[in-house]
Design a protein with these regions (language model features):
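Pyridoxal 5′-phosphate
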Residues: 1-370
Length: 370
């Protein structure tokens, strides 16, 4: 990923998307012609294409320390989330779900179709761990859903104790790790895991779903065996190869990159806290290394985002789950900041100190123009 989307724009919205990581770009442009064949056929080119797809899947599995046949490529965004939740519940005799109240908007909306219980959060967007565990014990749902970290403010959730209780009660836990950008070790405290490759420099369009072998999953789509019975469609193999290649490249320098970005976020937090009327959101310590959100009291978020864009910075504003729209965030509302627009910064992998300093200057100038 690059800090600049062009000669003038610095990408401070890397969680949404950004330029391709070099190894991903190479995969898309240098693969042999057979990479574009249907991998389900029996002729030579098809078998060769299948080997490329299997290799990409295996490389992802090795990094996540799972088996290749537990890794599937699925549609990104709301379509993929719906596929996951529907597939898990379709395999269950009951339809009770426990989730946090600050999951992605698509998850919250999908859960309205089922018997769901949403667990409250504090003013940093961390769930009430005690309440979550008590509800697991009393309701005994067929599925628990919990984000690895919040998609808007970066706060990490207490995954381990929740997973431990789910294991005791034989309840599958679906962990949405789509905002970790490959920078955080997601460990093994989950039964179902979702990753978003576009956040680490792979092309937009496919997400990575990992379902452990002991977890029941029955796709709502016609099951023809493709993608480990999760998604009945041919996968664009160059994209799958790009996902695997970019994750491998990131994994080689993950610790160094995460540490560098965490320091920059700390510097940015300290600078923002000195600016009048700015409230910095999320946990200052237990957080994603590359994400920071803040709101500016009585200031329109759209105005800030547009003016920062004019000054060369791409940021996200409003609800991060709502495409191209400035709408109040359900996450901020749950945190105690109803009807407030906010700015989310998510740093690209090669963001540097000068970028942070320039951003603070641009933001200060924007506020002075109000």
């Amino acid at each position: 990923m690059s800090a600049s989307t062009n000669a003038h724009m610095r990408n401070f919205d890397s969680l949404t998307s950004g330029p391709l990581e070099p190894s991903a770009k190479k995969a898309l442009t240098s693969l042999p012609d057979y990479a574009y064949f249907d991998s389900t056929k029996l002729y030579h080119e098809s078998r060769s294409a299948r080997m490329l797809l299997d290799s990409a899947r295996a490389s992802i599995a090795a990094i996540l320390k799972v088996e290749p046949d537990e890794v599937s490529f699925i549609p990104s965004g709301n379509a993929g989330l719906d596929l996951i939740i529907s597939g898990l519940l379709n395999a269950s005799t009951t339809k009770k779900i426990i989730s946090s109240s600050v999951e992605q908007k698509a998850i919250i909306e999908r859960l309205k179709s089922f018997d769901s219980t949403l667990i409250s959060v504090n003013n940093q967007a961390r769930i009430n761990e005690k309440e979550f565990i008590e509800k697991l014990e009393s309701i005994k749902p067929s599925l628990a859903i919990l984000q690895f970290s919040n998609h808007e403010v970066g706060t990490q959730q207490p995954i381990h104790p929740i997973y431990k209780k789910c294991q005791e009660l034989n309840i599958p836990l679906f962990v949405d790790a789509s905002m970790t950008a490959g920078l955080v070790n997601v460990g093994n405290d989950w039964d179902v895991l979702l990753l978003k490759p576009s956040s680490w420099g792979a092309p937009i369009g496919l997400d990575v779903l990992v379902v452990k072998k002991n977890i029941k999953f029955k796709s709502i789509l016609l099951d023809d065996g493709r993608e480990n019975h999760k998604f009945s469609s041919n996968i664009f193999i160059p994209q799958a190869v790009a996902i695997g290649a970019s994750l491998e490249a990131l994994n080689q320098k993950r610790g160094e990159t995460a540490k560098s970005l965490s320091i920059l976020i700390k510097d940015l937090r300290e600078a923002l806290e000195k600016i009048k009327n700015i409230i910095v959101l999320g946990d200052p310590v237990a957080r994603l290394p590359h994400v920071l959100s803040f709101l500016i009291e009585n200031v329109d978020g759209e105005f800030i985002a547009q003016n920062l864009s004019k000054k060369g910075f791409a940021v996200s504003s409003g609800s991060s789950c709502t495409p191209d729209a400035i709408k109040p965030s359900h996450v901020l509302s749950e945190m105690g900041y109803p009807n407030q627009a906010h700015i989310r910064v998510s740093l690209s992998f090669n963001t540097n100190k000068d970028d942070i300093n320039d951003f603070v200057v641009a933001l200060t100038q924007t506020l002075n123009e109000i």
